[in-house]
Amino acid sequence: FNSGDVLYLIMPDRFANGNPSNDVVPEMLEAKVDRNDPFARHGGDLAGIENNLDYLSNLGVTAIWLNPIQENDMKEGSYHGYAITDYYQVDRRLGSNEEFCKLVEQAHSKGMKVVMDMIFNHCGSENYLFKDMPSKDWFNFKGNYTQTSYKTASVQDIHASDYERKIAVDGWFTESMPDLNQRNRHVARYLIQSSIWWIEYAGINGIRQDTHPYADFDMMSEWCKAVTDEYPDFNIVGETWLNSNVLVSFWQKDSRLAAPRNSNLRTVMDFPLMEQMNKAFDEETTDWNGGLYRLYDYLTQDLVYADPMNLLVFLDNHDTSRFYLNEEATQNIDRYKQALVFLLTTRGIPQIYYGTEILMAADKANGDGLLRCDFPGGWKNDPRNCFNEANRTP
């Protein structure tokens, strides 16, 4: 995927339920579905996505980014997919490996690419690799829970202590997400081989790497190079959630700020632009400090990037408040249209979060589960079916 594409981000459990028979797998730890609980599984699956590929194609989508589909056999919160318990297996509540291959094939037949979400920084605590470690050094802090500081800016901070960097990179994301030690050559090989296997097996077109700066820099650089050496046209985007373009640019391939080190990561996520867009369209452009001037001022700083066209740009995603936040604050259709026009025409690779096109609203202050509400019409007997054009806003 590249700047000629429009990525559409889908959380599979919340998009559409095409096969109710796989909603509950009795032998899995979270064996229930409750659509009234935003933190529970809701039953969306790969079949539901495949059934609605024509809808996506008609929107103009050219690439689909799926939140993790690999097995997440965790006791709770397994719907989001970010605590993998088997790197080689699709979660059975979403479908099978064969069904994923079929989805990719069908997407390709309609001119759409498929981007797979992967997580090398951590796995789920129910992963067999953690429950029966090949050796203690497969996980950081010898498998003992030690919380990360989340301060990944320390990686490039010239004033940071070694301890600050270690606790940020080696610390665990949460207690249920043990931190993999990518410096262990066996761990590195396992992760690299698993990603290449999915490329070969399923024919995916790209990878989005979660929590990219939290993993070991050198191993992740080796991985990016290994993949793109084998597949020169393949793209990887790393989640680089940092609050300035200078910090984000450090992680892009051939960054002058990282030299002589090189991440070999072609595409990074432009979180700072997301913040600027969420402010700019709420302000009047009356002086040199606010409104649309924010965007102009920010884009004039693109010289810090090695390749500004390889930035993933977005208004929101599954971890942030939706741009269409709430009725009191930001539900202004003119603001919304302006922002979407800017998103789709600025430099970089535009990404749209599912439901953007039907004005789905959510505030992160009310919990992450509500950022990931069910798409109306994805379940039988939904009172409104937005996959049907007649039920959408003219």
Go through each PLM region and give its residues:
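Hydrophobic faces of well-ordered beta-strands that scaffold small-molecule active sites
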Residues: 6-8, 64-66, 114-116, 207, ...
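Carbohydrate-interacting/catalytic domains
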Residues: 1-9, 16-17, 25-27, 44-62, ...
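Substrate-binding/active-site clefts of carbohydrate-active enzymes
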Residues: 1-5, 13-202, 220-230, 246-247, ...
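Active-site clefts of carbohydrate-active enzymes
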Residues: 176, 305-331
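Active-site-proximal helices and loops of the catalytic beta/alpha 8
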Residues: 108, 122, 127-130, 194-196, ...
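Short, flexible loop/turn elements at secondary-structure junctions
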Residues: 11-14, 70, 91-94, 120, ...
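Generic recognition of stable, solvent-exposed alpha-helical segments in well-folded globular domains
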Residues: 48-51, 98-102, 190, 214-222, ...
